[in-house]
Amino acid sequence: DIVIETIGGVGVAKDFVMMALKEGKTVVTANKEMISKCSHELERIAKRNSCGLYYEASCVGGVPIIRTLLDGVQANHITEMMGIVNGTTNYILTKMAQDGADYQTALKEAQALGYAEFDPTNDVEGFDSTYKLSILASMAFHTKVPYTKVHREGITSVSATDIAIGKEFGYVLKLLAIGKNGEKGVEVRVHPTFIPAAHPLANV
């Protein structure tokens, strides 16, 4: 049997998933918050009961990044990762850049179009990106990277002026999830970042 968890959050969802795994049922979930906070505990239960815990959809939706990290690049030593992992904030920042709109105007349009939740905190304050980075960095760097270790800054303080000044100098502002694994250990952060207009991520 396969159980698909769509509850969201950690409390009830985690209890439900634990119960299913203990019954030997494979679980599929897109719950990035639960996975970032509880994956090791849940994976131990799954292994003990000879069932699976699959969460490909928890990070970057249609891109099979988790499967790639697990199976496709195991022979590689990854030292750095960087990407745009939240569509809501990317839409808002792109709208601000293209139309010269302020943050609130761009947010309201995103909400009207269904790109942003009624309460957008999880996205615009960087929590969503933080959970995803915690999951991806843990896999890429082969060590548990707690979400609490991720330095987090959202986009709520970004102004149209910030974006316009960056544009004058040939830069684009994006909310990036950045992970580095060096001699001093793992560094993980989510924050608005100016990148050159010629950078591959600038046109995302």
What do these predicted regions represent?
Residues I2-E5:
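N-terminal Rossmann-like NAD(P) cofactor-binding module of classical short-chain dehydrogenase/reductase
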Residues I7-E23, A30-G72:
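Rossmann-fold NAD(P)-binding glycine/threonine-rich loop
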Residues I7-K14, M18, I78, G87, ...:
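Short, composition-biased local secondary-structure segments
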Residues G8-V10, S58, N86, T193-P196:
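Short glycine-rich anion-binding loops that position phosphate/pyrophosphate groups of nucleotides
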Residues V10, I35-S36, G100, F127, ...:
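Short alpha-helix boundary/capping motifs
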Residues E23-T26, G87:
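Glycine-enriched alpha-helix->loop->beta-strand junction motifs that scaffold or abut catalytic
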Residues K47-D128, I135:
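Rossmann-like NAD(P)H-binding beta-loop-alpha module
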Residues T105-N203:
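Substrate-binding/catalytic subdomain of NAD(P)-dependent oxidoreductase enzymes
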